[in-house]
Design a protein with these regions (language model features):
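Active-site segments that bind and position negatively charged phosphate/pyrophosphate groups
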Residues: 1-68
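C-terminal charged capping/lid subdomain of soluble metabolic enzymes
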Residues: 42, 49-129
């Protein structure tokens, strides 16, 4: 799903953040927001990419995969939130980033879950901890 990239483009542009670091800071919040809408995809990611081998419900396995990705980011010195990235967008800046992201596409975005303005704001806010 290219949506995390689109969200990062607006954040990176506003705060002059490199794309990779910005993606790492946004991806966990995006993933936790959309995983239930494409649960089989996140279970495959957890098992096949992150090597999650424990048992549990599909939801538990998906979340373990997301957590494993965050652990990987940290292991290579990458941030997994805006705080770790060293930025603290205001509510007005978050609203502006979401509005610009939606305007650039003209409609709801994403394949894991179609995200509207409120969804984008929620993801940015979740990353801003």
């Amino acid at each position: 799903d290219f949506m995390s990239h689109k969200l990062e483009h607006e954040m990176g542009g506003m705060f002059d953040v490199t794309h990779g670091a910005g993606l790492a800071a946004l991806w966990p919040s995006w993933a936790r927001y959309v995983y239930k809408d494409c649960l089989p995809r996140f279970v495959r990611f957890a098992r096949n990419v992150m090597g999650v081998t424990t048992d549990g419900t599909d939801e538990e396995i998906a979340l373990k995969g997301i957590d494993a990705m965050v652990d990987f980011y940290h292991s290579i010195g990458m941030p997994a939130s805006f705080h770790e990235l060293g930025i603290a967008p205001t509510d007005a800046q978050i609203d502006e980033m979401a509005r610009r992201c939606l305007e650039a596409s003209g409609s709801a975005l994403g394949s894991a879950k179609k995200l509207d303005l409120d969804d984008m704001i929620a993801i940015y806010r979740a990353a801003n901890h």
